[in-house]
Amino acid sequence: MSIRLRAEMADLPAYAPGKTVPGAIKIASNETVHGPLPSVREAILKATDLINRYPDNGYLDLRERLAKHVNFAPENISVGCGSVSLCQQLIQITSSVGDEVLFAWRSFEIYPLQVRTAGATPVAVALRDHTHDLDAMLAAITDRTRLIFVCNPNNPTSTVVDPGELARFVAAVPPHILVVLDEAYVEYIRDGLLPDSLGLVREHRNVVVLRTFSKAYGLAGLRVGYAVADPEIVTALGKVYVPFSATSVSQAAAIACLDAADELLARTDAVVAERTRVSDALRAAGYTLPPSQANFVWLPLAERTLDFVARAADNRIIVRPYGEDGVRVTIGAPHENDAFLDFAQRWIAPGGAGPRTGDSA
């Protein structure tokens, strides 16, 4: 007799992270190339002395430090095992069978999976020019809508919503619907496009900002994220939280990162400079790509996506495909970017997809 599982699990795909191939250049998962600062390493090492003890499940020290960092009260802060766990918690506290959760598409791949797992209905609104079509999202709101995700900058297309348009969108959403501004890549925004998302939290009780230590702060392997929200929402998030899921080592590392925030965020300038160099070189080679405000670029290659990815793998370069929509390429170290650009220029050349492994250039 087979185990009786929920019927809807049968056709629910598992989340597929970026591949790792030993010895290859991996620019598929939007990781920072920089390791932790010495002060962060020291905090991590010190925290291992107490790993036989359970971590602080209330995250008191970390919440106080985060509150100072964003100029809110600790009661406005919720900590999670990466911001992805907070996405799931936000769905759990708002949505169930018969409810709808709205998001752009393509956007963060986890949204529809988490929505379906909760028994709710995902409603995907097509992007316009690779960014959120906020008017179309407003038009898609129904009396069943409970939650709206705005991934900004958008993953995987790298674009950011105009700050003024975002503010008007938030103001137009009915106040009983939660609006989640998922800002995993906010530290890479330049060109005057940084939204006043925390100001929107102050103005609107239904707005939540999600941020993470996985990208600019370089703690992807330790899994720490946080939400800034109304205390009522924070309290509800605590009711569906998996206890102890942000470890004592993770908390210590996050606090040390906040102590060194200026130094860590200065590293993003180097990433942005490389982003500009890579984007310019790709356009010069003949690629079309939207302006990136993240630590990656988006190549909308359509039906050529899978060939590009396979040929890149032949050249020991791992990038991230999204069906037949396009390819996401992380901005890596300069030498990694050079290797990628060399391949990309050969691939797009007339008659070319670049030499396969073992072929001469």
From Swiss-Prot:
Cofactor: pyridoxal 5'-phosphate
Top-rank taxon, per record: Bacteria
Post-translational modification N6-(pyridoxal phosphate)lysine, affected residues: 215
Its EC number(s): 2.6.1.57
Subunit description: Homodimer.
GO BP terms in the entry: L-histidine biosynthetic process
Lineage: Bacteria, Bacillati, Actinomycetota, Actinomycetes, Mycobacteriales
GO molecular function: aromatic-amino-acid transaminase activity; histidinol-phosphate transaminase activity; pyridoxal phosphate binding
Catalytically driven reaction(s): an aromatic L-alpha-amino acid + 2-oxoglutarate = an aromatic oxo-acid + L-glutamate
Originating species: Mycolicibacterium smegmatis (strain ATCC 700084 / mc(2)155)
Keyword DNA damage belongs to the record: no
The name this protein goes by in its record: Aromatic amino acid aminotransferase
HAMAP family in the cross-refs: HisC_aminotrans_2, Phe_aminotrans_2
Function of the protein: Aminotransferase that catalyzes the conversion of aromatic amino acids and 2-oxoglutarate into corresponding aromatic oxo acids and L-glutamate.
Family: Belongs to the class-II pyridoxal-phosphate-dependent aminotransferase family.
Keyword Transferase among record annotations: yes
Keyword entries, A-Z: Aminotransferase, Pyridoxal phosphate, Transferase
Coiled-coil blocks: none
